[in-house]
Each structure stands twice: as structure tokens, then as C-alpha cells.
């Protein structure tokens, strides 16, 4: 089964659950993620993906290491997560999703919370 088909199945499994963005901060704390020194967060109604990709390209061209998360994907789930302008590999995507899903099995999270 392709990663996209597998993740589409996961979306259906979790689609009944309510989205609560406040939970995300607690999830990040539980994962003990140490954020990089600088983070750029882009908000608003229109143009977030284009702006994020433009900034990402400028930073990369100036020798910065970059990570980019955008949502929703246009074609494949892999395009949501980029490291130095390259989409995350299928194997990595599935590995990390399963790891997070297992860690938070008792949390009753929706797909967005698990994937973000």
C-alpha cells in the first residue's frame, strides 16, 4: 500500500475526532522536541504556502539549513514536510507517524494533531 493510501486510511480513522489546537503545545512538550534557534511562523488567510516556500528558498540559497511544514498537501502527504527543500521520504514519514501514533494512543487525537 502506498504511503498516500495508508495516510488516507488514517485520515478516515481519525476524522470523527474534534480538532483542538491547544492540545498541540502539550503534545510537543511530551515529545521533548528541542526547537531550532529560529522559527518563522506564517499566519493569515491567503498566500501562506507561497510565502513559506519563498522564504525557505531564500534561506537555503543563503546556506541556511531549513525545515518546512505546510498544510494541506496538494498531491502527496510527503510535500507537507521538507528538509532543505526536499520532501520527507515515504519511509521516514510512515516511521515518524507510527511512532507518534503509538506514543499518543491513549490521547484520542485527530489526524491533524497526530500529523502536525
Regions found by a protein language model. Give the residues of each.
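Short functional linear segments
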Residues: 1-44, 51-53, 57-62, 69, ...
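ATP-dependent carboxylate-amine ligase catalytic core
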Residues: 21, 28, 32-35, 61-116
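Short active-site-proximal "capping" loops at secondary-structure junctions
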Residues: 46-48, 73-74
Amino acid at each position: 500500500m502506498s504511503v498516500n493510501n495508508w495516510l488516507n486510511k488514517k485520515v478516515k480513522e481519525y476524522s470523527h475526532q474534534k480538532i483542538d489546537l491547544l492540545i498541540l503545545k502539550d503534545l510537543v512538550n511530551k515529545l521533548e522536541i528541542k526547537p531550532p534557534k529560529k522559527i518563522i511562523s506564517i499566519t493569515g488567510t491567503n498566500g501562506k504556502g507561497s510565502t513559506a516556500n519563498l522564504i525557505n528558498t531564500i534561506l537555503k540559497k543563503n546556506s541556511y539549513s531549513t525545515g518546512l511544514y505546510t498544510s494541506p498537501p496538494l498531491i502527496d502527504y510527503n510535500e507537507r514536510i521538507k528538509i532543505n527543500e526536499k520532501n520527507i521520504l515515504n519511509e521516514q514519514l510512515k516511521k515518524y507517524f507510527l511512532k507518534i501514533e503509538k506514543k499518543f494512543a491513549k490521547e484520542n487525537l485527530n489526524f491533524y494533531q497526530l500529523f502536525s
